[in-house]
UniProtKB/Swiss-Prot annotation:
Residues annotated as domain SprT-like: 22-163
Binding site for Zn(2+): 78, 82
Keywords per UniProt: Cytoplasm, Metal-binding, Zinc
Source organism superkingdom: Bacteria
Disulphide-bridged cysteine pairs: none
Gene: sprT
UniProt lineage: Bacteria, Pseudomonadati, Pseudomonadota, Gammaproteobacteria, Enterobacterales
Protein's name in the database: Protein SprT
Localization, UniProt: Cytoplasm
Family: Belongs to the SprT family.
Length: 165
């Protein structure tokens, strides 16, 4: 999806949130970190990614359109926090104590590692697998690893190895 397909109001709301949280961080940290590059090129089930070396945030336009309010409130600060942590502390654990501190103490946003958005529209082909207690859907990548004998996956609930249906 090209940026031009995203309504301008949503793009403006994203920029407003990014600038608001960046200004808040700069004030609290006593720094003058620059505005990162922003693109809408993230694909798949990831809501966004922070590219440290290029100081860029890539957002998933499909998930943004489907979950605008929650996405703007949570994902934009989440990715910004990664860039700010990298600038402030250098290379550290992606969701470590520095990131949690940046999210909660500096940006004032709950530190959640994953989103809870519905993924049906962005999920690629999946393969059904079973265990004792339920059916699972494995991604193409995980399925291929099983087929090649490179990986074994287990159910987090019952611990049984997953087998193809």
């Amino acid at each position: 999806m090209k940026t031009s397909r995203l309504p301008i109001a949503i793009q403006q709301a994203v920029m407003r949130r990014l600038r608001e949280k960046l200004a808040q961080a700069n004030l609290k940290l006593g720094c003058n970190y620059p505005e990162p590059k922003l693109s809408y090129t993230q694909r798949g089930t990831s809501a966004g990614t922070a590219w440290l070396e290029s100081y860029e945030i890539r957002l998933n336009p499909v998930l943004l359109l489907e979950n605008s309010e929650a996405f703007i409130e949570e994902v934009v600060p989440h990715e910004l926090a990664h860039l700010l942590v990298w600038k402030h502390f250098g290379r550290v654990a992606p969701h470590g104590k520095e990131w949690k501190w940046m999210m909660e103490s500096v940006l004032g946003v709950p530190a959640r590692r994953t989103h809870q958005f519905e993924l049906q529209s962005v999920r690629r082909n999946t393969f059904p697998y079973r265990c004792k207690c339920q059916e699972h859907q494995l991604t193409v990548r995980r399925h291929n690893r099983v087929v090649r004998g490179e990986a074994v996956y287990r159910c987090v609930h019952c611990g049984e190895q997953l087998v193809a249906k």
